[in-house]
Regions:
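C-terminal membrane-cytosol helix-exit motif in multi-pass small-molecule transporters
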Residues: 128-147, 340-344
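Helix-loop-helix hairpin linking two adjacent transmembrane segments in secondary transporters
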Residues: 94-139
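Residue-level signature of mid-helix packing/kink "hotspots" within the transmembrane helices
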Residues: 11-19, 103-104, 206-210, 214, ...
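Cytoplasmic helix-loop-helix junction between adjacent transmembrane helices
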Residues: 60-98
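Conserved MFS/SLC helix-loop-helix module at the cytosolic interface between two early adjacent transmembrane helices
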Residues: 16-52
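Paired small-residue
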Residues: 55-63, 259-267
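Structural signature of the two symmetry-related core transmembrane helices
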Residues: 32-46, 227-242
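Helix-breaking motifs and short loop linkers at transmembrane-helix boundaries and internal kinks
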Residues: 29, 50-56, 224, 246-247
């Protein structure tokens, strides 16, 4: 339970700051705010090293969560600022791919160092060194001049992109089964009897995302945003139903089930990989340039809320029933998301898009 508190306080802190970070990034110069949040995020690794109590460690964890929420919105917004509009989808695709690689390499490297007998102090020092290198790279990025904006009265649309709410609902529904997958797929594989190393599931998922980023961004830049998302939705719907069916395939043929299991990972990687930059671009295109930060924070907040709901509902359904029922429920949610996107989000986007 203590570990759960430590892990969750980081996520909750990041989620709480996201709407406000969009407002600050739209109101003030973006790069200085981004670098300030990056610096705070970086120094928290030094804080972990000197933390002498669990309370202090949790406090540093919360501060790092807040700074992470700001850094993710800030980095994404800076990328949008420096990319020409004709290649924005492609740029967001490669930027997202770098995040996916980092999220895979980071935990893997930490576990490798820990298994090699390294102390947590050494691991935190390595993390601090990596952040310092990233901070230097971020400092070298040249951003365009952002003219001062007239201070508008505080209102809801300064924190949430109201025109993006339908897209946010669709994305939230889509991220619930994604959250179930990232947190419980290894337990699901063990429950149904797949003996292969389930860590390869995420490897294949990362490969799928990398493959999709090669071509999806360029298609988005040609204006086919809703078409790309629709294609990704069809692929993801099929994949989640196939994942839930693995419980029946295992009783027929273990080898076939294992192949299908890892094929699902590849398909999910491609499906989500083509949708990420498309969804991001969709939110940005619904917002004026002065609200790019708000658009990005709305996009990321929708995704994070869905991930959190997926963690909770997936665990609950598996507890009262089985994991395959949880993934079947997730597959049904993707159908709802697909129908809602095609019926509501796409028409709303084409009606309200600014570019």
């Amino acid at each position: 339970s203590t570990i759960g508190i430590i892990l969750s306080c980081y996520t909750v802190a990041a989620l709480c700051i996201r709407p406000f970070s969009g407002y600050f990034l739209d109101s003030f110069a973006r790069k200085p705010l981004y670098l300030m949040a990056y610096f705070i995020f970086m120094t928290m690794f030094a804080g972990y090293i000197i933390a002498g109590s669990l309370t202090l460690f949790i406090m540093f964890r919360i501060i790092q969560g807040v700074s992470f929420g700001m850094v993710t919105v800030g980095g994404n917004t800076v990328v949008i600022d420096i990319m020409p509009s004709s290649r924005r989808g492609e740029g967001l695709g490669y930027y997202g791919l770098s995040n996916n690689i980092a999220m895979a390499v980071g935990p893997m490297s930490g576990l490798f160092l820990h298994d090699a007998g390294m102390s947590f102090t050494t691991i935190f020092c390595c993390s601090l060194g990596s952040c310092m290198a990233g901070f230097v790279c971020a400092s070298l990025v040249k951003t365009p001049y952002k003219p001062p904006v007239r201070r508008e009265p505080i209102s809801l649309d300064r924190f949430i992109l109201l025109k993006g709410i339908p897209a946010g609902i669709s994305l939230l529904l889509l991220s619930i089964p994604y959250g179930m997958t990232t947190n419980y797929v290894a337990m699901y594989a063990k429950q149904i009897g797949i003996n292969a190393t389930t860590g390869f599931f995420f490897t294949f998922m990362a490969i799928g995302m990398a493959i999709s980023r090669i071509f999806s961004g360029k298609i988005v830049d040609r204006g086919k945003i809703t078409q790309v998302i629709s294609a990704g939705l069809y692929l993801v719907v099929f994949s989640f139903f196939l994942l839930s069916a693995c419980v029946y395939l295992i009783s027929w043929n273990n080898m076939v089930c294992t192949i299908v299991f890892f094929s699902v990972a590849l398909l999910l990687g491609v499906g989500f990989g083509i949708m990420f930059p498309a969804y991001n671009t969709l939110f940005v295109n619904l917002a004026p340039n002065s609200q790019r930060g708000t658009a990005t924070s709305t996009y990321l907040t929708s995704w994070d809320v869905g991930i959190g709901i997926g963690m909770l509902t997936g665990g609950y359904i598996a507890e009262v029933s089985t994991f395959d029922k949880a993934y079947l429920f997730g597959a049904c949610l993707t159908i709802v998301s697909m129908l809602y996107f095609n019926g509501k989000v796409a028409p709303n986007y084409h009606k309200n898009k600014l570019r």
